[in-house]
Amino acid sequence: MTDIQEKLKNYISSELEYWDFSGVIRIVKDSTILYETSRGFASIEFGIQNTMETRFEAASVSKQFTAFAIMLLYDKGLLCLDEKANQYLPDSMQIPADITVHQLLCHTSGPHNNYNFEDDFYVGADRMPYDREQFFRDWILKDAGNLSKKKTRNSFNYNNSNYNLLAWIIETVSGQTYSEFMEEHIFSKLGMTQTAIDDGQRILRNKANNYMHDYGVLVRVPYTNSLYSIGAGALVTNCDDLQKWYECLRTKNLLSERAYQIFLSENTNHYCYGLEWYARNSYLHGGDFLGVSAYTHYFFDENLCILLLSNTESLDQYRLGTGIAAILHNGQAPHYYRPEEHLLAPQDLAKYTGTYLPGKIQIEEKNGKLYLVRVNQNIHIELYCVGKDSFIRRYEEQQTPHRLIPDGGGQPSIWGYKRIREPL
């Protein structure tokens, strides 16, 4: 074992044990695996452990594949990136006329973001049977009047809706379903036999279940219909296939040189097409969803990549990935420790409890512990005090505490929402 491998092993092992990680990590240099590990369970119910062959949901790591598919259509002369997106969408699914395909790809188009606190989409409407046109009408086109009034579309606003629309462009232009196109033109050509688009129904063998902490105990995440993540998420894959994908990008396979130049060019806010330009001329994209953490970091000039897939949200994959990259480049990778707990009596916790956004955000006290109630009232996330009016999650890494009462006092608030009702 080389010195670098020993450092990677020691650092990653200490991090994963401290944060109770469940998933897989692989680091590849010059097509050789420098380090890999699998931890935790793919199925807690049946005692099935994760292995390096386990398949995981990849959340927003999916976006780089959608963007690549658009570039395949570009290479075939089937679409122009600077043309209006409406030219490639069905007549019944038209968006404000000035939005281009390029703006969708780099998140500067400005459609409605349905993953917000106020809307009833997240763990609400996205649990229903998938209807493409209804989804478009009710959740993508929402606030279209305000959207049409925008004079410029140069500001960055990361939004899954952009990539939902791109998936529908792929379907319209190709005449195939999004899943069929990805399978025929990307997955099968690269031998990615363990990669698929999850339609929420077909059985994907060796796929890990996703878990979250509810009242401090790991539970299955609430059901959502993965088709509502089309283009923006829904990819299921494993480390072997992601390594094949990295090699495709590194060797510039499947696309023309010109298409790769566009695909990897930095736009607003360091965003390319489905990837972010990062330090050392590298490209990165992660993903987060209910019980899902994913991370891909590519150093093409050095023939180096970092891959992480997890079926819990216990650890900050971006911090860990940055630490791994630091070791690979002879730097220091600091360990992040949970801040010391400041014990509070139940009566002291009570001043934070109540409703902050009806049906969406609530804080409750139970058996001397404070819980943030989220995910449509399904998940109770334990918080503990780390300073005056400051709290963090106990079981998931969180580096910036929730400041529940602002400096100078006032009404309790979280994420900008003031408490509107105290508990009865």
What are these model-derived regions, one by one?
Residues 21, 29-30, 41-160, 176, ...:
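Active-site-proximal loop and beta-strand segments within enzyme catalytic domains
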Residues 27, 116-121, 153-154, 199-201, ...:
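Short coil/turn segments at secondary-structure boundaries
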Residues 34, 65, 71-90, 173-201, ...:
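Short, well-structured active-site flanking segments
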Residues 34-35, 92-100, 110-117, 189-199, ...:
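Secretory-pathway/luminal and periplasmic proteins that interact with or process carbohydrate-rich
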Residues 66-67, 162-167, 240-244:
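Well-ordered alpha-helical segments within folded domains of soluble proteins
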Residues 111-112, 163, 312-314:
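Solvent-exposed loop/turn segments at secondary-structure junctions
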